[in-house]
Amino acid sequence: MDIKLKDFEGPLDLLLHLVSQYKVDIYEVPIVEVIEQYLNYIETLQVMKLEVAGDYMLMASQLMLIKSRRLLPKVVEHIEEEDLEQDLLEKIEEYSRFKAVSQALAKQHDQRAKWYSKPKQELIFEDAILQEDKTVMDLFLAFSNIMAAKRAVLKNNHTVIERDDYKIEDMMASIKQRLEKESVISLSAIFEECQTLNEVISIFLASLELIKLHVVFVEQLSNFGAIILRKEKK
């Protein structure tokens, strides 16, 4: 089974999405946390052998530079460091304004299109809304953070990554059986039991498929809260 995700319009679009989750002014977000989430997303795409565009990798290298300088001991204030971070935040803010204008123009275009007799062709995106206003991409971003933590655990435990083949159908059946007993489970709890990254990926894909089929329902009470799977919709 292949996973198909709607791409962001570029690295700034991804960064804006991550920043907007904090519900604060762009210049007040914890920039290191945002950078870590961005890097987790890129690394997860690579682990899952999904294509990563060059501009995303270029941004990743710039973010790693900002993060490394942020984490170094503050002996002397570096003006260049402040400039890099300030420049990044200004670009995100500028992109946010540009996107808002673009969306407003698109809305006006849609309104005008209603006056024509020819019906407007519907566009179907892979990034469909699931339950609780969560999209496929929202779940993937949350999963990438969990995936990064799991990679660290496996690395620290010197776990051997075996080339096991996990069938999505088997994982779907396993999740449904578990929900029959527990009715509510968290994805992170399931991932903790996994022994390989392949198993983690397969469980995520199985969960995503069950959610899209409305066999199970997803819930995340806060932007950075646990992802909960439940048998019945609340």
Curated annotation (Swiss-Prot):
Self-association state and partner proteins as the record states: Component of a cohesin-like complex composed of ScpA, ScpB and the Smc homodimer, in which ScpA and ScpB bind to the head domain of Smc. The presence of the three proteins is required for the association of the complex with DNA.
Record keyword Disulfide bond present: no
InterPro entries, per database record: ScpA
Gene3D superfamilies linked to this entry: 6.10.250.2410
Protein's organism: Streptococcus pyogenes serotype M6 (strain ATCC BAA-946 / MGAS10394)
One GO term (biological process): DNA replication
Entry's localization field: Cytoplasm
Pfam families: SMC_ScpA
Function description: Participates in chromosomal partition during cell division. May act via the formation of a condensin-like complex containing Smc and ScpB that pull DNA away from mid-cell into both cell halves.
Main location class: cytoplasm
Keyword field: Cell cycle, Cell division, Chromosome partition, Cytoplasm
Protein name: Segregation and condensation protein A
Annotated family: Belongs to the ScpA family.
Superkingdom: Bacteria
GO cellular component annotations of the record: cytoplasm
